[in-house]
C-alpha cells in the first residue's frame, strides 16, 4: 500500500502540471520518447527475454507468449505508434460548443483531462507504452499495473519512458508503474479513490470481472471479445470464407478475433466443407453443434461453455442456425458486446442485424479485426470499451477527456 500511496500522490501532483502543458511541449517529449525506445532496443529485448523464458518454463501456450514477445520489429512499430500519436489532434482545450443564454452569459464547453488514470492490464508489454503515451498526450497522469508475466519488460519500458519524459522537462511521476504484482496490491489500487479519477482494466474476462467486483474507483470496462461471424443464406461463398479466415486466424490472441461461426442452414452443407479446408491450413480446432458436426469431417462436439468462451487461440465454435433472427438471439445471449459481423448480400437482413445486435461495433461484409483505433482511422486507443457510459468502442484521445463549462459574464446575478 505504501507504493500505491507514494505513486498516487506523485501522480496527483503531476496531473496539475500536465493539465497546463502545451501541445507543442507534449509532442516534443513524445518524439524524444519515440527515438529513445529505438536507442534502448537491445536492453528492452534482453529484459523481455526473461519474461519469455519464464512463460515457456510455465508451459504458457504459444499464442499467449506471442502477446508477451517483443522483437526488434515490434519495438520499431511501438516507436512509430508514438510518432502517430504526435500527429493526432490534441483534444485538450478544444471548445466543443459555445452559446449565449437569456441572461446574456456566454457559456462555453471545453475538453479537459480526466486527471489521474489507473490501468490494470495483463501480459502485453506494448500496452505499457500505448497507455502511457495516450494518457500523456491528453494531459492525464497514469499509474500502470501490468501482469507478473511481463514485469521485466514493463520495468525496462517504464525506465525508458520516465527517463525520456524527465529529460523533456516533465515530472517522472507523470507515468508510473506499480512493480508489486500481487493480487492484494491490485485490489488496493482498485480502491484508490483518493488519487485515481478512473480505472481502466485491459485483459481477460476474469481480470475485468475482478475489477468490476472490487473497484470503488469509477471503471471504464474494456470487455472481452467473444466475437461472432454470421454467414447468412444470402452470403457470397468466397467472401464468407475470406472474412472468416481473416477474423479467426490473422491474430487469434486479440480481442477482435472471431470465436464463433454461425451459419444459415441453407448454405451450411455447401459452405462448411470449404471453410473447414481453409481453416485446416492454420490447424484450427473446430467445436461444432450436432448439425455442423454432421457436415464437417473433423470437429469436436461443442459444449455450452464453447459458446461463452473467448478462446484467444486457434479454436472456433460453429453452429448452424435456421434464420438470421436465431443468429441475432444467439449473439445477444452469448456475445460480449464487442464486435459482431454478418456476411450477407441482402440489404434488409444486414440492416436488421445491425439494428438488433447489441455491440460496440457491428460489421456488414467485413472482418471483426477492424475494431481498432488505427484501423478505424482515428489513431491509437487505450482499449475497446464494451459499456455504454462515457465511452463505447475503441477509446482514442477524445475518450480520455472530460468536459468543463466556462461561463463569461459582466456582473449578472440570478434572480
UniProtKB/Swiss-Prot annotation:
Q: Does the keyword Protease apply?
A: no
The yes or no answer to whether the keyword Metal-binding is present is: no
Q: State any single GO MF term.
A: NADP binding
Q: What main location does UniProt list?
A: cytoplasm
Q: Where in the cell is it found?
A: Cytoplasm
Q: Which SUPFAM superfamilies does the record match to this protein?
A: ALDH-like
Q: Which GO terms describe its biological process?
A: L-proline biosynthetic process
List, alphabetically, the Pfam families matched: Aldedh
Source taxon at top rank: Bacteria
Q: Which UniProt keywords apply?
A: Amino-acid biosynthesis, Cytoplasm, NADP, Oxidoreductase, Proline biosynthesis
Q: Which CDD domains match?
A: ALDH_F18-19_ProA-GPR
Record's catalysed reaction(s): L-glutamate 5-semialdehyde + phosphate + NADP(+) = L-glutamyl 5-phosphate + NADPH + H(+)
Q: Which InterPro entries match?
A: Ald_DH/histidinol_DH (IPR016161), Ald_DH_C (IPR016163), Ald_DH_N (IPR016162), Aldehyde_DH_dom (IPR015590), G-glutamylP_reductase_CS (IPR020593), Glu-5-SA_DH (IPR012134), GPR_dom (IPR000965)
EC numbers, comma separated: 1.2.1.41
Q: Which GO CC terms are listed, alphabetically?
A: cytoplasm
The biological pathway it contributes to is: Amino-acid biosynthesis; L-proline biosynthesis; L-glutamate 5-semialdehyde from L-glutamate: step 2/2
Q: State the protein's purpose.
A: Catalyzes the NADPH-dependent reduction of L-glutamate 5-phosphate into L-glutamate 5-semialdehyde and phosphate. The product spontaneously undergoes cyclization to form 1-pyrroline-5-carboxylate.
Family assignment from sequence similarity? Belongs to the gamma-glutamyl phosphate reductase family.
Protein name as it appears in the record: Gamma-glutamyl phosphate reductase
Species lineage, top-down? Bacteria, Bacillati, Bacillota, Bacilli, Bacillales
**Gene, per the UniProt record:** proA
